[in-house]
């Protein structure tokens, strides 16, 4: 099963909701492609959280994303 992270693209305004991108948590290349995209600029910080109950590791993305069209 492919796990995915849902995060806003910061394209929303105070009057409209942000749009969202889906990124597979287990494929770092998806994040790299966003950072290297010629149409947008992204600063992505990956924060790892460990859960002692399940011993699972989840990813938290903190980022800023601006369009350069």
Curated annotation (Swiss-Prot):
Protein name, entry field: Uncharacterized 8.0 kDa protein
Organism: Vaccinia virus (strain Copenhagen)
């Amino acid at each position: 099963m492919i796990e995915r992270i849902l995060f806003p693209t910061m394209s929303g305004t105070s009057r409209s909701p942000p749009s969202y991108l889906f990124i597979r948590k287990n494929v770092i290349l998806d994040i790299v492609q966003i950072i290297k995209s010629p149409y947008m600029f992204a600063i992505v910080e990956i924060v790892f959280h460990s859960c002692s109950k399940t011993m699972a590791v989840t990813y938290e993305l903190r980022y800023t994303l601006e369009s350069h069209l």
